[in-house]
């Protein structure tokens, strides 16, 4: 799926859905076909390997620059239903900065990006590309923290039920949440390295306020790492006490 959006003007941040690619637009690509990838590469001049990179769910967080195109790959959090229970996972998202456009590519539709489409983000403009990247990164941190709080609440509820009566279902749910914390921890630590590198990229140093925003994102990411580690230690302790 390919969606092309453009902010109406400097004074109006509402998005217009376009039929064709224009300078200053945002190209949002979700689970694309090979034909769609070739089309985007041809129309934008972005290397096909940049567009394909996030479609490998094992792709790690990184920054790469080639012929004036910068790709930032970060892991973003998702929720999924599995056996009538909400589970948490991460998938790669590519944010590609070119001279004329911003392109996002992901295997799945993400709340992080639909929030921009649905007008939930203030002062968002598709043509302010470096600021847009930072706003996406900030939204990713927000969802990590939100999902970590959800995991915390779910874990406490399950632990209370387990102490009343040992049930396989609760144990399975607890192990599932532990797995989610491992995914989050790995992804957040990889993202941290990418965010630190982003501070040194020339295109992100144009405006001093952008650097401030990026530093705030790095702080939030560190908070999410700390929350993940604390919750994971508590999980391990709880599972050990239950198996004793």
Walk through the language-model features, giving the residues of each.
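Single conserved hydrophobic/aromatic residue that forms the stacking wall/gate
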Residues: 235-244
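Peripheral, non-transmembrane regulatory/ligand-interaction domains of membrane transport proteins
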Residues: 1-207, 213-227
